């Protein structure tokens, strides 16, 4: 992972606290490596499911 990818992952970790899965998904598009895209995608999916659980959708 590049330094830029590490910064994107750190930003996504901050966004996870606010259940902002769509913004994390946008960061996924900015990632430079496949590994970073995978990590960010997993974070977006996890955040989406946490948001659903918090809203009692599941």
Residue positions per predicted region:
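Short, charge-rich amphipathic interface segments used for partner binding and complex assembly
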Residues: 19-58
């Amino acid at each position: 992972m590049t330094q830029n990818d590490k910064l994107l992952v750190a930003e996504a970790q901050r966004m996870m606290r606010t259940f902002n899965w769509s913004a994390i998904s946008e960061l996924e598009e900015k990632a430079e490596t496949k590994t970073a895209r995978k990590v960010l995608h997993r974070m977006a999916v996890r955040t989406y499911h946490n948001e659903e659980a918090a809203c009692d959708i599941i």
